[in-house]
Amino acid sequence: MTTSAARKGLRTRGSACPRATRSASSISSRAQVIVAGPITDKLAQRTVAHLLALAEDSDEPINMLISSPGGHVESGDMIHDVIKFIRPTVRTIGLAWVASAGALIFVGADKENRYCLPNTRFLIHQPSVGIGGTSTDMMIQAEQVRLMRDRLNQIFAEATGQPVERIEKDTQRDFWLNTQEALDYGLLGKVIRSVDELK
């Protein structure tokens, strides 16, 4: 997950758009959003605009397909929070890889609405950031990274049912999970092979 300490925001290691817009990294249709590629501010803005437009049109469930290596933490926060904010149910569907800020978006949905295709991998880890400037600035930035890490640990603990201490320990390094491991961990609700398996 990426964040930058003044945009430098804070960057993590390691898409969607309004109805009429389509691109290789962001394809949309009614009640469907595809988030693919790095999580950036621009992608987050388009995704949120699309989610809000769909929510205004209808209360029907929205399917969000996610395949991402991660990106900016704050951009992931933006999408995560709007998934919870809007009235329609959002079903997140992982494919290929759901990593870092992508995983943060993925757990914006309730556990029973988190799906993935069979060959999906998941990654969670601590945010990373380049710290620079004066000694005072570096202290401030380090404190912001600590607060972000604690907040993300709490989000994933609540999303998975794991103790915060377990999340903190597991994410000291890159923590990869296959589909069965993600199910056991509480990150994933169900593995599906067909759209017909969506409830």
From Swiss-Prot:
Gene of this entry: clpP
Subcellular location: Cytoplasm
Keywords associated with the record: Cytoplasm, Hydrolase, Protease, Serine protease
Region listing for Disordered, in residue ranges: 1-23
Lineage: Bacteria, Pseudomonadati, Pseudomonadota, Alphaproteobacteria, Rhodobacterales
InterPro entries linked to this entry: ClpP, ClpP/crotonase-like_dom_sf, ClpP/TepA, ClpP_His_AS
This enzyme's EC code(s): 3.4.21.92
A GO term from the CC aspect: cytoplasm
Annotated active site: 100, 125
Organism annotation: Paracoccus denitrificans
Subunit structure: Fourteen ClpP subunits assemble into 2 heptameric rings which stack back to back to give a disk-like structure with a central cavity, resembling the structure of eukaryotic proteasomes.
SUPFAM superfamilies found in the cross-reference section: ClpP/crotonase
GO terms under biological process: protein quality control for misfolded or incompletely synthesized proteins
Name of protein: ATP-dependent Clp protease proteolytic subunit
GO molecular function, one term: ATP-dependent peptidase activity
